[in-house]
């Protein structure tokens, strides 16, 4: 039995892709090991609007993870202690200097210095809290690499505890920078989402022996009722193309909508179902929509599962994805997937012969949809390939087993370099 501490900026009841993944994996690990969670944000608080010129110019949002962080109470979920490491009122003085680089002129001319300076302030407050929680711990796993991840790494180094991080971001994209990449060799292990990400980090100088693929897990209800879903939404005996996600342009919603008219030229009874919250930019896209367009908005996890199980094709031709769990969910029900050219997605979909990765244009999307609807055998084969992939590599037991093996290996591995990031 090992003692494992996860360090994450946010955790349940805060809800997000990373938080859901962390909760699933932690619960499964807790069946055999002592697992605890340390997090700064355990709620739903979003940055509040600060009126006037100051509110518009200052980087107010960045302060809600440190200086303006809410105070939460620790609790226990099943066998897992969830420790809140949010700052006390008395910690505010130590974090006060973090306010300075939010001023536009200072940020513009001294950003590298303030990145370093801010972290020193942050570590002075959060480091001791994390060190206290790490007493007797065998492995520290940092989820995402921000100031809390840096503090978790430094605390683990100070106590001689091996550490691993899973950045949950693709190399070179939003959420990662050169300072973060320079930090990776200090961890005993770094988890990447795909082999493509692993190769990219190797090319950027991260030692290959430090890099391990740690997949994500599809989020599925216990049972689904696709027939009931089709009956409820008047979709009986018609082809159904499903989109699940936020209605943002980069997700491919607008392009998919436009593709429908081209699909109807060949397959006029095809219906398009959109599940997910709206965005301000998307409101006009669905005005006066054809009756074969169904927008269901935000739904429960149960109804989302029913929708995926009921569709013929899952289509989300996104330009950017970090955790493409919805593709895995579609494959869990043997559905062929049409994705976009987001980093890592073509390798995931076409590399496993489980669908198509297309350009985000109505022409490319409609061609892929039409091809699948006109060739049921191909569609079934691609969906089955995806199902095999999920069962072999992305099941909860498979992902947890891989993490568990990595932790055990790290316990006997020499500590990584002690060089601090500057």
Regions found by a protein language model. Give the residues of each.
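Conserved donor-binding/catalytic core segment of Leloir-type glycosyltransferases
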Residues: 5, 191, 235-251, 257-260
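Donor nucleotide-sugar binding/catalytic pocket of nucleotide-sugar-dependent glycosyltransferases
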Residues: 21, 39, 172, 180-224, ...
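Glycosyltransferase donor-sugar binding loop
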Residues: 44, 244, 248, 271-284
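Nucleotide-activated donor-binding/catalytic signature segment of Leloir-type glycosyltransferases, i.e.
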Residues: 283-303
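Aromatic "clamp/platform" in nucleotide-sugar-dependent glycosyltransferases that forms part
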Residues: 319
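Short hydrophobic beta-strand element within catalytic cores of glycosyltransferases
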Residues: 336-339
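Conserved acidic donor-binding segment of nucleotide-sugar-dependent glycosyltransferases
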Residues: 351-363, 371-377
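A short, well-ordered alpha-helix in the C-terminal region of glycosyltransferases
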Residues: 364, 371, 378-392, 399-405
């Amino acid at each position: 039995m090992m003692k494992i501490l996860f360090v994450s900026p946010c955790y349940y009841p805060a809800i997000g892709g990373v938080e859901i993944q962390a909760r699933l994996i932690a619960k499964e690990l807790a069946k055999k090991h002592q697992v605890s969670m340390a997090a700064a944000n355990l709620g739903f608080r979003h940055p509040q609007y600060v009126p006037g010129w100051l509110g518009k110019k200052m980087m107010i949002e960045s302060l809600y993870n440190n200086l303006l962080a809410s105070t939460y109470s620790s609790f226990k979920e099943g066998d897992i202690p969830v420790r809140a490491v949010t700052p006390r009122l008395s910690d505010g003085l130590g974090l006060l200097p973090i306010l300075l680089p939010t001023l536009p002129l200072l940020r513009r001319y001294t950003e590298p210095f303030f990145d370093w300076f801010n972290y020193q302030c942050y570590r002075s407050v959060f480091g001791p809290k994390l060190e206290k929680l790490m007493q007797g711990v065998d492995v520290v796993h940092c989820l995402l690499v921000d100031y809390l991840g840096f503090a978790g790494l430094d605390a683990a180094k100070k106590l001689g505890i091996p550490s691993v991080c899973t950045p949950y971001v693709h190399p070179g994209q939003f959420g990662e920078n050169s300072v973060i990449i320079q930090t990776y060799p200090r961890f005993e292990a770094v988890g990447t989402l795909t082999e493509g990400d692993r190769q990219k980090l190797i090319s950027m100088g991260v030692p290959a022996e430090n890099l391990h693929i740690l997949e994500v897990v599809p989020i599925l209800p216990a049972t689904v009722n696709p027939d009931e879903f089709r009956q409820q939404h008047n979709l009986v005996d018609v082809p159904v193309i499903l989109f699940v996600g936020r209605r943002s342009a980069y997700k491919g919603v607008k392009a998919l909508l436009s593709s429908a008219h081209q699909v109807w030229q060949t397959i006029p009874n095809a219906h398009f179902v959109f599940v997910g919250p709206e965005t301000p930019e998307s409101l006009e896209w669905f005005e006066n929509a054809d009756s074969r367009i169904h927008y269901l908005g935000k739904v429960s996890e149960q109804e989302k599962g029913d929708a995926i199980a009921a569709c013929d094709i899952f289509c989300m031709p996104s330009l950017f994805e970090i955790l493409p769990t919805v593709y895995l969910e579609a494959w869990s029900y043997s559905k062929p997937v049409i994705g976009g050219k987001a980093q890592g997605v073509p390798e995931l979909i076409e590399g496993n012969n489980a669908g198509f990765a297309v350009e985000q244009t109505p022409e490319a999307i409609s061609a892929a949809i039409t091809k699948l609807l006109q060739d049921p055998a191909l569609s079934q084969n691609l969906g089955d390939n995806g199902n095999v992939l999920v069962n072999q590599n992305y099941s909860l037991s498979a992902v947890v087993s891989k993490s568990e093996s990595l932790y055990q290996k790290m316990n006997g591995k020499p500590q990584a370099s002690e060089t601090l990031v500057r």
